[in-house]
């Protein structure tokens, strides 16, 4: 076997392989001998068909199969010999071939980039230092009560915390626009569901009043014909309702899995959940900064085949989220996923090099901690832990998570880390908007 390797462009490679005629003929003869033992041809007993008859009947197809097999096997041998690391499916191109002669073919493919990590010491990371305070727990308890609140009609003026039932008609330059009119529309205030200024215009008015508010549609509004336009809304306020928060009774508290129904037990459970969320938020905040720094410090060429594969994964995930099928997933525009796919591939290559160069292996103790942390959010944590321990695929997925964490921590150990005190709400709001 003769092999030559050339670079086509960037990460592209072309391997040219020549297989000697005697290798081909030996393989063809061997396959014909095997075929002669199995084929059935009228006039001959099974296994007694003369070789010349077998060759005449099956020679062409056997030779074709042999050439296909030799192409694949010799390519594998070639890349092992040349220490080439291909990515994606190779593209085989057979050359001209005459029976009894040598066979030359080419294989084109991309290779993984050579990654040499640099700039780790220059990565800057701001690590949040956060404590869950009693005031944070109070705020979370208020949120839980609001989620379970009932509504009671009131005759006072509307506030930003109320629920309003309205009729409205919107117009631009005196013309009512499509989608700008509704009756008995129930609006929970303070959730920013409407365009800026709409809810503010309702505050201070009472049920039974009719009034007009002036607002501007945002420049990035989803409807093209309304972007940046000034509009007027005539509003009839039909009903104002205020929240009635439930008391922290034993019955109410038990809904949240606190067996003894005590306020102390509820506060302890809420604090535990908040601290678990906080730990994850801090970890993700630090991880994002580490990965951003790693990407910015290491500009690497990315194989198109890897990006294509990641785009397919993201397409299928998007289709599953919205109830679509695989065919619909493949029809989603590539541009929707290309940037995210490239980032994921780059992160994978860089962290892969961190893992390889530092000879990292998944820490089983860390794997167990990760499973326990995840399981603690379920009603029966032990059942979840046992389920993971018996599921090899899930266990390997968690090992990959642990290994990624270890790689991030390895980079973090070399980075410039500055601690910054922030409040629980500040950090969680940053996490939500990131």
Curated annotation (Swiss-Prot):
Function summary: Involved in protein export. Acts as a chaperone by maintaining the newly synthesized protein in an open conformation. Functions as a peptidyl-prolyl cis-trans isomerase.
Full protein name: Trigger factor
Primary subcellular site in the record, as a coarse category: cytoplasm
Domain notes: Consists of 3 domains; the N-terminus binds the ribosome, the middle domain has PPIase activity, while the C-terminus has intrinsic chaperone activity on its own.
Cellular location(s): Cytoplasm
Family, similarity comment: Belongs to the FKBP-type PPIase family. Tig subfamily.
EC code(s) of this entry: 5.2.1.8
Key words of the record: Cell cycle, Cell division, Chaperone, Cytoplasm, Isomerase, Rotamase
Catalytic activity: [protein]-peptidylproline (omega=180) = [protein]-peptidylproline (omega=0)
Keyword set includes Cytoplasm: yes
GO biological process, one term: chaperone-mediated protein folding
Annotated ranges, domain PPIase FKBP-type: 161-246
Any single Gene Ontology cellular-component annotation: cytoplasm
GO molecular function, one term: peptidyl-prolyl cis-trans isomerase activity
